[in-house]
Amino acid sequence: MKPDFSGEYVLNRPASTLSAIVAPVAQSGVLRIEHHEPKFTAHQTIVLDGKPFESNFELLSDGREVVTDAGGRRIVSTLRWDGDALVVTWRIHGPDGEVTISFRYELQDGGRRLRAAEQLRGGGRDQDNLWVFERR
Protein backbone atom coordinates (compact mmCIF):
# COMPACT_ATOMS: atom_id res chain seq x y z
CA MET A 1 0.00 0.00 0.00
CA LYS A 2 1.39 3.38 -1.05
CA PRO A 3 1.46 6.27 1.46
CA ASP A 4 -1.21 8.98 1.41
CA PHE A 5 0.40 12.43 1.26
CA SER A 6 -2.84 14.33 1.99
CA GLY A 7 -2.49 17.15 4.50
CA GLU A 8 -1.28 20.64 5.18
CA TYR A 9 2.42 21.14 5.85
CA VAL A 10 4.38 24.16 7.09
CA LEU A 11 7.95 24.85 5.99
CA ASN A 12 10.56 24.08 8.64
CA ARG A 13 13.14 26.59 7.42
CA PRO A 14 15.96 25.59 9.87
CA ALA A 15 15.64 21.91 8.89
CA SER A 16 15.74 22.70 5.16
CA THR A 17 18.96 22.81 3.13
CA LEU A 18 18.61 25.47 0.45
CA SER A 19 20.85 26.65 -2.38
CA ALA A 20 22.83 29.89 -2.19
CA ILE A 21 20.23 31.50 -4.48
CA VAL A 22 17.22 30.59 -2.33
CA ALA A 23 18.59 30.40 1.24
CA PRO A 24 18.99 34.16 1.86
CA VAL A 25 15.43 34.99 0.75
CA ALA A 26 13.31 31.97 1.81
CA GLN A 27 11.17 32.95 4.79
CA SER A 28 8.15 30.68 5.13
CA GLY A 29 5.91 28.33 3.23
CA VAL A 30 2.82 26.17 3.23
CA LEU A 31 2.19 23.04 1.16
CA ARG A 32 -1.35 21.64 0.86
CA ILE A 33 -1.77 18.21 -0.72
CA GLU A 34 -4.90 16.27 -1.65
CA HIS A 35 -3.93 12.72 -2.55
CA HIS A 36 -6.52 10.18 -3.66
CA GLU A 37 -4.43 7.62 -5.53
CA PRO A 38 -3.77 8.02 -8.40
CA LYS A 39 -4.83 11.71 -8.31
CA PHE A 40 -2.36 14.07 -6.60
CA THR A 41 -3.08 17.79 -6.18
CA ALA A 42 -0.58 20.21 -4.63
CA HIS A 43 -0.82 23.90 -3.79
CA GLN A 44 2.36 25.50 -2.47
CA THR A 45 3.03 29.04 -1.29
CA ILE A 46 6.63 30.00 -0.50
CA VAL A 47 7.46 33.49 0.77
CA LEU A 48 10.73 34.74 -0.73
CA ASP A 49 12.00 38.16 0.32
CA GLY A 50 8.54 39.13 1.57
CA LYS A 51 6.72 38.10 -1.62
CA PRO A 52 4.52 34.99 -1.84
CA PHE A 53 5.14 32.68 -4.81
CA GLU A 54 2.38 30.19 -5.51
CA SER A 55 2.47 27.01 -7.54
CA ASN A 56 -0.25 24.45 -8.16
CA PHE A 57 -0.46 21.20 -10.01
CA GLU A 58 -2.70 18.19 -10.40
CA LEU A 59 -1.38 14.99 -11.94
CA LEU A 60 -1.98 11.25 -11.90
CA SER A 61 0.76 9.03 -10.47
CA ASP A 62 0.79 6.76 -13.51
CA GLY A 63 4.01 8.19 -14.99
CA ARG A 64 2.33 9.28 -18.22
CA GLU A 65 3.48 12.51 -19.83
CA VAL A 66 1.04 15.42 -19.81
CA VAL A 67 1.84 18.11 -22.37
CA THR A 68 0.61 21.70 -21.99
CA ASP A 69 1.45 25.02 -23.60
CA ALA A 70 1.78 28.16 -21.49
CA GLY A 71 3.03 31.53 -22.67
CA GLY A 72 4.92 30.16 -25.66
CA ARG A 73 6.48 27.37 -23.63
CA ARG A 74 5.80 23.66 -23.97
CA ILE A 75 5.64 21.91 -20.60
CA VAL A 76 5.89 18.13 -20.25
CA SER A 77 4.82 16.93 -16.77
CA THR A 78 5.01 13.49 -15.16
CA LEU A 79 4.26 12.05 -11.71
CA ARG A 80 5.48 8.57 -10.79
CA TRP A 81 6.13 6.38 -7.80
CA ASP A 82 9.71 5.51 -6.83
CA GLY A 83 9.24 3.09 -3.95
CA ASP A 84 7.24 5.04 -1.34
CA ALA A 85 8.30 8.41 -2.80
CA LEU A 86 6.42 10.41 -5.42
CA VAL A 87 8.52 12.15 -8.08
CA VAL A 88 7.09 14.99 -10.17
CA THR A 89 9.06 16.33 -13.12
CA TRP A 90 8.45 19.27 -15.43
CA ARG A 91 10.44 19.69 -18.63
CA ILE A 92 9.89 23.24 -19.84
CA HIS A 93 10.80 23.93 -23.48
CA GLY A 94 11.01 27.65 -24.21
CA PRO A 95 12.69 30.06 -26.59
CA ASP A 96 15.82 30.08 -24.39
CA GLY A 97 16.20 26.29 -24.20
CA GLU A 98 15.04 23.62 -21.79
CA VAL A 99 14.67 23.75 -18.02
CA THR A 100 13.90 20.65 -15.94
CA ILE A 101 12.43 20.92 -12.43
CA SER A 102 11.78 17.87 -10.28
CA PHE A 103 10.56 17.28 -6.74
CA ARG A 104 10.87 13.99 -4.87
CA TYR A 105 8.26 13.88 -2.09
CA GLU A 106 8.82 11.53 0.85
CA LEU A 107 6.98 11.19 4.15
CA GLN A 108 9.10 10.78 7.29
CA ASP A 109 8.54 10.37 11.03
CA GLY A 110 5.32 8.42 10.59
CA GLY A 111 3.89 11.02 8.22
CA ARG A 112 4.54 14.00 10.48
CA ARG A 113 7.26 15.36 8.18
CA LEU A 114 7.40 15.75 4.40
CA ARG A 115 10.74 16.00 2.63
CA ALA A 116 10.70 17.61 -0.82
CA ALA A 117 14.02 17.29 -2.68
CA GLU A 118 14.03 19.82 -5.53
CA GLN A 119 16.38 19.72 -8.48
CA LEU A 120 16.47 22.47 -11.11
CA ARG A 121 18.59 22.10 -14.24
CA GLY A 122 18.99 24.45 -17.20
CA GLY A 123 18.43 28.10 -17.88
CA GLY A 124 21.78 28.96 -16.29
CA ARG A 125 20.46 28.48 -12.76
CA ASP A 126 21.12 24.90 -11.73
CA GLN A 127 20.29 24.34 -8.08
CA ASP A 128 19.32 21.73 -5.51
CA ASN A 129 17.07 22.46 -2.54
CA LEU A 130 15.90 20.18 0.25
CA TRP A 131 12.63 21.57 1.60
CA VAL A 132 11.39 20.10 4.90
CA PHE A 133 7.75 20.57 5.91
CA GLU A 134 6.00 19.64 9.18
CA ARG A 135 2.39 18.41 9.19
CA ARG A 136 0.07 21.04 10.64
Segments predicted by a language model, with ranges:
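Hydrophobic small-molecule pocket/channel-lining residues, especially in calycin-type beta-barrels
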Residues: M1-R136
